[in-house]
Regions:
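Start-transfer (signal-anchor) and selected internal transmembrane alpha helices
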Residues: 1-79
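Transmembrane-helix motifs of polytopic, lipid-linked glycan transferases
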Residues: 151-171, 209
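Membrane-interface transmembrane helices that cradle and orient dolichyl/undecaprenyl
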Residues: 210-227
Length: 228
């Protein structure tokens, strides 16, 4: 069992490094050497923290976490704009339809929403958001809508990472919560998906909130007994 766990850790580090190289490759195409530097440091940092977690004094864990958490939002937004892709698939369709409705008052893709009814609620929420933006910024256009939606999506992901830290803190304590939070803050798939204000980003926040509240209820034995 110990060998299996060690093998899984090695595979995790390798996959993490490969993914980080791909991401950094899109950001630092001007220098091949720069692509390899961040994965090495990040992998070494994760290995060091997980193997030497006892060096983390509990009184410093909160300070370290707040520093990492604050930097996480900056990196989320920076990654999202540096790795920005053209609007496509369902997210692009909802973004374009919401912008069209707010800017022109028309909706050409009615057949699409008749077929994919799950995107109707997402469209309503996006239209409402863009109407608020249009009210605050009368000259706002499609690019403004897209950029603001990216920032809001990053905030959703950032809050979800914060909830993961709170969940770990509730279950394991400050020290392990700090490690779990830093690992969540370094989870690159979250960075790659943060630019899409689609069902998954607010859904992840709602899921983590529900999980946190469920743990709070479970630990509150008095309320738990009343509930059942």
């Amino acid at each position: 069992m110990h060998h299996v766990e060690k093998l899984c850790n090695i595979l995790y580090v390798l996959l993490f490094g490969i993914l980080l190289i791909v991401v950094m490759g899109s950001m630092f195409t001007w220098s091949f050497r720069m692509v390899w530097i961040p994965p090495i440091f990040v992998a070494l940092f994760i290995i060091y923290i997980t193997k030497k977690k006892r060096i983390l004094k509990e009184e410093w864990c909160s300070v370290l976490w707040y520093i990492v958490y604050g930097a996480c939002l900056v990196f989320l937004i920076a990654f999202s704009f540096l790795c920005e892709v053209a609007p496509s698939w369902d997210w692009g369709q909802v973004l374009e339809s919401a912008s069209e409705y707010v800017l022109k008052g028309t909706l050409d893709a009615k057949e699409y929403y008749a077929r994919y009814t799950n995107n109707q609620l997402c469209l309503i929420c996006m239209v409402t958001l863009f109407q608020w933006i249009r009210f605050a910024l009368p000259d706002a256009n499609f690019v403004d809508f897209q950029e603001i939606s990216i920032v809001i999506s990053c905030i959703f992901v950032w809050l979800s990472i914060g909830m993961i830290y709170l969940i770990a803190k509730k279950v394991w304590g400050k020290r392990r919560a700090c490690i779990a939070g830093m690992l969540a803050a370094g989870c690159l798939p979250l960075y790659m998906y943060a630019q899409f204000l689609y069902t998954d980003t607010p859904g992840m926040l709602l899921l983590t909130i529900q999980l946190y509240l469920g743990i709070c209820i479970y630990k509150s034995h008095r309320f738990y007994r009343k509930l059942w």
